[in-house]
């Protein structure tokens, strides 16, 4: 990954073909200025074929034991680019986490309807609040953290542009369960 995610590895999916992302990108939510949608249609266009393959493999059927990757990272991100496509997709990410118990995984999603039941103990679920300037003070049921975006500076911002690898607030179970970042608008 690059930018604030430098140093992290991730499994990404294709936002351009994700029906949820297509719909949300036409709203005034944070998705209306989605960095991934813009990058995959511009500077990261070359990533679309590989990430489309990930979208298909993760969402169409349960992964077999042979398909489960070995992740040799302390922290790993699901979806530096992408969003859950369906329940099968979520279950496959859980399978990957279960297969790699020494790694802490973090998954951001706006798809609360797909999160239910047990999850692996090494998976941090972060609700990605789609509404700018409506800070949720606690995570929804089933989530470990909530990630909020604000348009103007606030004294309680705790995601302030540093490198994620230097902070790790989102990648540790302890610490704040409420993350607040100022919006980075991309057009």
PLM region spans:
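Class I S-adenosyl-L-methionine
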Residues: 1-187
